[in-house]
Design a protein with these regions (language model features):
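N-terminal segment of the mature folded domain
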Residues: 1-23
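Periplasmic-binding protein-like
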Residues: 14, 102-134, 155-160
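Flexible hinge/capping segments at coil-to-helix
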Residues: 19-40
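Ligand-binding cleft/hinge of the Venus flytrap
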Residues: 31, 45, 49-72
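Hydrophobic residues within well-ordered alpha-helices
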Residues: 33, 53, 81-85
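Ligand-binding clefts/hinges and TM-proximal coupling segments of bilobed small-molecule sensing domains
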Residues: 43-55, 139-168
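A mid-sequence, solvent-exposed acidic-amphipathic segment
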Residues: 62-88
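A ligand-binding cleft/hinge motif common to bilobed small-molecule-binding domains
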Residues: 81-111
Length: 168
């Protein structure tokens, strides 16, 4: 509050369920996580994926106590994908990009996330920030990020909010 800000769009990525190849348990939604034959591997408190899981469960009216494996925590997308691949869990949540690294799982889309950078106006106008934004907006940089796979770089570097009159 009281601080002039600029929000710069960076990229989007897809989040979804990691399930065993062929989705043998036919997991389609968060509602399925309350089934007694489904076990999830969760992410650590404070992670973006954990926030997503908790919010989706809340929206569905599913108490965390009703989700088998909710207390079983891993610390990365790859650990979650590997747990599903090994059969230690039926489902996990993570980014599409990381699912591509584990051939024994399938990815089921849940939502797209937007990654944005918030910059104070006083910093936005400084030369180092302007140079960083120039790099972010360059086709070379965007091609490199897109080449990593799993990221949508459309509108990268675009100002999506400004309460200070700053222009793209």
């Amino acid at each position: 509050p009281g601080t002039d800000l600029v929000v710069l769009h960076l990229l989007k990525r897809k989040q979804g369920f990691y399930v065993q190849k062929g989705n043998p348990k036919n997991i389609q939604s968060f509602e399925d996580l309350k089934r007694s034959d489904i076990t999830i591997v969760n992410r650590e408190p404070g992670s973006g994926v954990r926030v997503l899981i908790d919010e989706k469960l809340r929206q569905a009216g599913i108490p965390t106590q009703e989700v088998n494996g909710y207390q079983k925590v891993v610390n990365s997308h790859l650990e979650a994908a590997a747990a599903v691949n090994r059969g230690d869990a039926d489902v996990a949540v993570g980014s599409e990009k990381h699912s591509l690294s584990v051939p024994g799982i399938d990815f089921l889309f849940i939502q797209e996330e937007s990654y944005d950078m918030v910059i104070r106006k006083e910093d936005f106008l400084k030369k180092p920030y302007q140079k960083m934004i120039e790099i972010i907006r360059s086709s070379e940089y965007q091609k490199e990020v897109a080449g990593l796979g799993g990221y949508n770089v459309e509108n990268m570097g675009k100002i999506i909010y400004s309460d200070c009159g700053c222009r793209p």
